Amino acid sequence: MSFLIDTNIISEVRKGDRCNPHVSRWYASIADDDLFFSTLVLGEIRKGVELARPRDPDKSAALERWLFEVETAFAGRVLGIDNAVSDQWGRMSAVRPIPVIDGLLAATAVTNGLTLVTANDRDVAGLGAVVHNPFRSGEDRQV
């Protein structure tokens, strides 16, 4: 089984010793080759870098280094938004209003046969994606 990782999960993992123990255990149990990112996650991290820059240059620099590490670690496993993902997102977002990035992540997961790993499982409920929230106990579920 392979997984598409949301920003909230990789950000939690980044906390190291302060990471939620359920998230930490789950992440450590998955082979690197089974973990994928969306280009949207890289964009969200970049946004964090830029938002921090004017008020906390040290934090911005640390986030910039982390972004580079993530891009390097996930080279070849970063998925973009193509016509198939856009089509799936259009179908999902017609069901009900959903946050755009969460919907595009769910569409990317469905299109690529991946399980979406996110803390925002309720945001994509009822859209047909297989979702795992490692903050919660229980099995993966199609929502």
Where are these regions (language model features)?
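Short, well-structured N-terminal submotif of metal-dependent ribonuclease cores
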Residues: 1-41, 51-65, 69, 138-143
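A generic structural signal for short hydrophobic patches within well-formed alpha-helices
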Residues: 10, 42-45, 86, 124
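Acidic, PIN/NYN-like endoribonuclease modules and their adjacent C-terminal/linker elements
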Residues: 1, 106, 111-143
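Short, flexible helix/strand-to-coil boundary loops that buttress conserved ligand/catalytic motifs
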Residues: 14, 49, 93, 128, ...
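Short, structured coil segments at secondary-structure junctions
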Residues: 31, 74, 127-128
